[in-house]
């Protein structure tokens, strides 16, 4: 197409939300009208599926659960009074708690006020709060936030070192739906030990976000506060529940504006017309690009520093939801869309070279922010500001990709604020739901994650047996013998990696032999 034809296509496929000031442009996806017509029955079903989901249907059949994250910003739509209370009561409790923390009605035992927040959680309990903190936290928030989102001892040490003496004025939020997530438990126990090492009582500094009756709920009985998670909200869609709203509010972020923006977008994405429903349009673009099979990766390119973590947040939302081996009918399908990204225009000096000229196995999503900054910008060249350069880079990169047959979507937002961030979260949540329906997968469970957890648990059980065998043995053992004595003769490689790790950390294990030839190694206590 020439430039005028592209301009006409842009206008034909442009979506604009007047209330939010958000534009969605899918004109650089090269589908045609017959393709859209063929998908109409699938979208009709997707609209019906979403209506049933919001009415309280068991949309997660594998776990027998309702899917209710859309109710979080519209409690009146919840199917019963109990569900409505599960939304409104925690919201009121968060508002009351945050007010009391900020005005020092609630304060730590040995400091005048809480100065910092330490959020301990993983997956959806971390990625959403991290994205929102990066996007919306002010330069001088009422409380600075820090995250422990892994079981990495060095990473934990780094956070605790940064806090230093401020640990006594740090409010710790421990987030785990079941209370049994190993990484979160580990982080909590490490931090609890750090408090005790300084002679501080952990409980008056700690808050839990978990399901009522969970292991964490019971463990946190004497903590400063407990906030509930709903059974019908998954981790990757929990940012607008207590999981994300509590840490955001403590940073001074307007959580009511986030909820309002999400609610406005939800209204727009309930429209049962493809061309006037932004989430349906985005799902159409995804389906076209990957041929309904996820054949192309999704590259997220936000041209705003504060949106740096958006790609990491979307990585979990999209990949954990859509990456499924089987569909709802039990057929093996291997669905999913790989997501990665960084930020523009940094990416133009990193991997855009490959996007433009390498393997065409992706589609790009540009995120454009119209407002450059608060306040005026200086001119770097006559009539040109740094923001003009950034705008030029996004338009130029989009055109350069299109000219070499690389498709893209562009989302344009007026500015980065709580209302718009809430709307973006809602837009992508609904798009994932629509796409899940289009390809007939359960977008609300994660059996692959659970499989990994079980395998990790089996490794730790094997380690316990190995340590016992080594302690009781006289002399050294080769790896094969050690595996046999530990009760798993086929797990020689796992045994090798366990003892190598123990030896590297001075954990009572010595390795003798040629490290380049693992079969030669002898293991002994020491």
Swiss-Prot record:
GO terms (BP aspect): gluconeogenesis; glucose 6-phosphate metabolic process; glycolytic process
EC number: 5.3.1.9
Entry keyword Isomerase: yes
Main location: cytoplasm
Keyword Lipid metabolism annotated: no
Active-site positions on this chain: 320, 349, 453
Catalytic reactions of this protein: alpha-D-glucose 6-phosphate = beta-D-fructose 6-phosphate
GO molecular function, one term: glucose-6-phosphate isomerase activity
Domain of life: Bacteria
Pfam families: PGI
Pathway info: Carbohydrate biosynthesis; gluconeogenesis; Carbohydrate degradation; glycolysis; D-glyceraldehyde 3-phosphate and glycerone phosphate from D-glucose: step 2/4
InterPro entries the UniProt entry points to: G6P_Isomerase, Phosphoglucose_isomerase_CS, SIS_dom_sf, SIS_PGI_1, SIS_PGI_2
Family indicated by similarity: Belongs to the GPI family.
PANTHER family linked to this entry: GLUCOSE-6-PHOSPHATE ISOMERASE
Protein name per the record: Glucose-6-phosphate isomerase
Gene (UniProt): pgi
């Amino acid at each position: 197409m020439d430039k005028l034809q592209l301009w006409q296509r842009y206008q034909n496929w442009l979506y604009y939300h007047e209330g939010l000031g958000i534009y969605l442009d899918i004109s650089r996806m090269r589908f045609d009208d017959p393709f859209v017509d063929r998908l109409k029955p699938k979208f009709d079903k997707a609209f019906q599926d979403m209506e049933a989901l919001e009415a309280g249907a068991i949309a997660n059949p594998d776990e027998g659960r309702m899917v209710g994250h859309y109710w979080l910003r519209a409690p009146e739509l919840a199917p019963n009074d109990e569900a409505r209370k599960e939304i409104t009561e925690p919201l009121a409790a968060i508002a009351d708690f945050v007010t009391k923390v900020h005005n020092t009605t609630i304060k730590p035992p040995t400091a005048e006020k809480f100065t910092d927040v330490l959020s301990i959680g993983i997956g959806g309990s971390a990625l959403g709060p991290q994205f929102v903190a990066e996007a919306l936290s002010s330069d001088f928030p009422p409380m600075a936030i820090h995250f422990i989102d892994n079981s990495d001892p060095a990473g934990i040490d780094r956070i605790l070192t940064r806090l230093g003496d401020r640990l006594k004025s740090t409010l710790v939020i421990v987030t785990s739906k079941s209370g049994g997530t190993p990484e979160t438990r580990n982080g909590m126990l490490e931090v609890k030990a750090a408090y005790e090492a300084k002679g501080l009582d952990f409980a008056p500094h700690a808050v839990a976000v978990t399901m009522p009756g969970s292991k964490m709920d019971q463990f946190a009985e004497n903590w400063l506060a407990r906030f509930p998670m709903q059974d019908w909200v998954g981790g990757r869609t929990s940012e607008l529940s207590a999981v994300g709203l509590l840490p955001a509010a403590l940073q001074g972020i307007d959580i009511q504006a986030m909820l309002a923006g999400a609610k406005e977008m939800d209204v727009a994405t309930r429209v049962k017309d493809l061309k006037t429903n932004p989430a349906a349009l985005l799902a159409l673009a995804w389906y076209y690009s990957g041929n309904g099979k996820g054949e192309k990766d999704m590259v997220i390119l936000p041209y705003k520093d504060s949106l740096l973590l958006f790609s990491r947040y979307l990585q979990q939302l999209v990949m954990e939801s859509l990456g499924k081996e089987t569909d709802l009918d039990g057929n093996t399908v291997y669905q999913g869309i790989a997501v990665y990204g960084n930020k523009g225009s940094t990416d133009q000096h990193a991997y855009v070279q490959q996007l433009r000229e390498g393997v065409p196995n992706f589609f790009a999503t540009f995120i454009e922010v119209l407002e450059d900054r608060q306040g005026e910008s200086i001119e770097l060249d006559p009539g040109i500001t740094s923001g003009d350069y950034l705008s030029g880079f996004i338009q130029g990169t989009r055109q350069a990709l299109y000219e070499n047959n690389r498709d893209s979507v562009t989302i344009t937002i007026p500015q980065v604020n709580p209302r718009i961030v809430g709307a973006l979260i809602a837009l992508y949540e609904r798009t994932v739901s629509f796409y899940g329906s289009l390809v007939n997968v359960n977008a609300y469970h994660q059996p692959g994650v659970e499989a990994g957890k079980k395998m990790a648990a089996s490794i730790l059980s094997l380690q316990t047996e190995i340590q016992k065998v080594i302690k009781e043995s006289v002399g050294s053992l080769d790896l094969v013998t050690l595996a046999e004595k530990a009760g798993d003769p086929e797990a020689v490689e796992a045994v090798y990696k366990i003892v190598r790790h123990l030896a590297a950390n001075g954990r009572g294990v010595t390795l003798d032999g040629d490290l380049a030839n693992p079969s030669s190694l002898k293991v002994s206590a020491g």
